[in-house]
């Protein structure tokens, strides 16, 4: 039936998942973080409630990755903040996102 279709995989912004997200800030630099409530976290960045991005607004959500395991999300966030992780991020996901 038409209304019975279900998507497989993670549902966008579902509280059962942990999210690693990448923002582009007004200074054309990136910010990488992780959270379980992506909508709330992005809203907090946009309001200026997050010290790391408060003076770098407006922000734009560039991409996010969903993980069912918190530790995997945290490890991926840490990796993206390393030199090799940033190089992969810049090469594979974006034309240019600096630190």
Predicted ranges, named:
Residues 1-50, 57, 64-82, 86, ...:
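GIY-YIG nuclease catalytic motif and its immediate N-terminal context
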């Amino acid at each position: 039936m038409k209304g019975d279709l279900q998507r497989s995989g993670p549902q966008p912004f579902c509280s059962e998942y942990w999210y690693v997200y990448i923002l582009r800030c007004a200074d054309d630099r990136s910010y990488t973080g992780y959270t379980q409530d992506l909508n709330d976290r992005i809203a907090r960045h946009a309001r200026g409630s997050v010290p790391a991005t408060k003076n770098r607004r407006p922000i734009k959500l560039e991409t996010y990755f969903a993980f069912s395991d918190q530790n995997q999300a945290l490890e991926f966030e840490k990796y993206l903040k390393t030199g090799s992780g940033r190089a992969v991020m810049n090469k594979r996901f974006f034309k240019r996102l600096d630190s």
